[in-house]
Amino acid sequence: MTTIRIGVIGTGVMGTDHVETISKSIARAEVRAVADIDVGRAEAVAARIPGAKALSSAEALIESAEIDAVIIASSNPTHGPYTLASIAAGKPVLCEKPLAETAAECEQILRAEETAGTRLVQIGFMRRYDPGYVELRARVASGEIGAPLLAHCVHRNVSVPPLWTSEDIVLTSAVHEIDVMPWVFGREVVNVNWFSPVPNAPGVRRDPQVAILELEGGALIFIELFMAANYGYEIRCEIVGEKGTIELAPVSRTVARSDLRVQVDLAADWRPRFAEAYRRELQSWVNAILSWNSGDLNNVSGPVHGPDAWDGYRAAVIAEALVASMSSGGPVPVESLAIPGLYQQGRS
């Protein structure tokens, strides 16, 4: 197999972006089919991609003999069922976060992969492919700032979907920091705590929020989540160590100075900020599938070189602990399964 034939489930913002990125920028891969509950939208996306077609259902896409691998970018409640169907079909799958709506449902996916004896599932935690976070992790590991003690993270959006709840902010947005910061530090989360200021205008959600993650060894991660910050999309991260600090650099390409002001442009959402991360994620996923198909003995546990179903499960467990802290008003320990043997190989 020299080219991976990909089917994309969901043609909303994320699914359509994946279709376009694969078509324009990913080597040895092509989009052959899309599926969406809105058939007209799926047909419109397929019409822009030579050789692609809109299928009648996600199930038809997963089962198609013309599809080698599946991307799940549909609504959150569908992630678990479509991932399980892909495992049953023996097809590699890249599932956007969350892996499933609950940690218990994520556990079903772990069991399905254990039964299959193969890791087929990669979870879309694209920050692990962002050049800034990759360098942040490498420099922390190098020891140049000594032992890392704490991190300050900022995650701000322009606006929040009107039906989102306080819990949705944790389960859908905070999961990015929940995944990437233990990866940067190389330590697991053991306790969590959640806080929020009293809102000026109480409504359906608490925004902003602060999440505190305690890692093994006592390091702390402070995460500010502000989903209706209005001014722009912004991600910041600073690691404080015994001998110094490391932080993500600003990503604006230009800085304007005029009329006694300094100005930079901010994105309206996450896509410009993480465009390169998404491209690297997709190319790495395709390369891993090709390597696995070729019988690469260094990849015997499956076509996954990135965050896997175990990482999706851990993120869900930690997010649910934060939601429990939201309810209890105090710290909550993170309790999860012991890592199964299938997921121990190649972890770093």
Residue ranges and their predicted role:
Residues 1-49:
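N-terminal Rossmann-like dinucleotide-binding module
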Residues 17, 37, 230, 270-283, ...:
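Active-site loop of classical SDR/Rossmann-like NAD(P)-dependent oxidoreductases
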Residues 124-132, 157-193, 206-207, 311:
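Mid-domain beta-loop-alpha active-site segment that forms a flexible
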Residues 18, 49-112, 346:
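Beta-loop-alpha module in the N-terminal Rossmann-like domain of NAD(P)-dependent dehydrogenases
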Residues 77, 100-160:
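A contiguous active-site-proximal alpha/beta segment in oxidoreductase catalytic domains
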Residues 172-254, 279-296, 339-348:
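Contiguous beta-strand/loop segments that form the cofactor/metal-binding neighborhood of enzyme cores
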Residues 56, 95, 101, 121-123, ...:
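Hydrophobic residues in well-ordered beta-strands that form the structural core
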